[in-house]
């Protein structure tokens, strides 16, 4: 496989931490219910989606011989792993507000399980 990664690309894991007020206001995004629920929904999707992407990349990691590509893979996995942990914590806060997080995330998990069972590693990586 030929790499087409730009020479100047680097992925440095950023340790972004959400600075959430405690308690988290119901409509935390400027008091706007729409914006709040939009970002809540995104946060609910991210941990499982990020894990899917990490697993898809990790499957091929040992086949990559280029040290630079290996560093990019390591950076990607580190970045997504940290990002996912932040969303998991945020989602716990939503659960504390009374949201049924499992009911909202289970359909995504079912689709990911289906993709893992029915799609080749190459196809999952292409996602």
Regions found by a protein language model. Give the residues of each.
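Non-heme di-metal
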Residues: 2-127
């Amino acid at each position: 496989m030929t790499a087409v990664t730009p020479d100047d690309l680097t992925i440095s894991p950023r340790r972004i931490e959400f600075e959430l007020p405690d308690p988290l206001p119901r409509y935390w995004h400027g008091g706007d219910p729409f914006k709040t629920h939009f970002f809540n929904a995104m946060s609910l999707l991210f941990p499982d989606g990020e894990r899917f992407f990490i697993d898809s990349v990790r499957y091929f990691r040992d086949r990559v011989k280029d040290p630079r590509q290996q560093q990019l893979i390591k950076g990607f996995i580190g970045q997504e792993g940290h990002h996912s942990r932040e969303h998991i914590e945020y989602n716990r806060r939503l659960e504390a507000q009374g949201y049924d997080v499992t009911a909202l995330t289970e359909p995504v998990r079912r689709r990911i399980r289906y993709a893992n069972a029915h799609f080749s590693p190459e196809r999952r990586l292409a996602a």
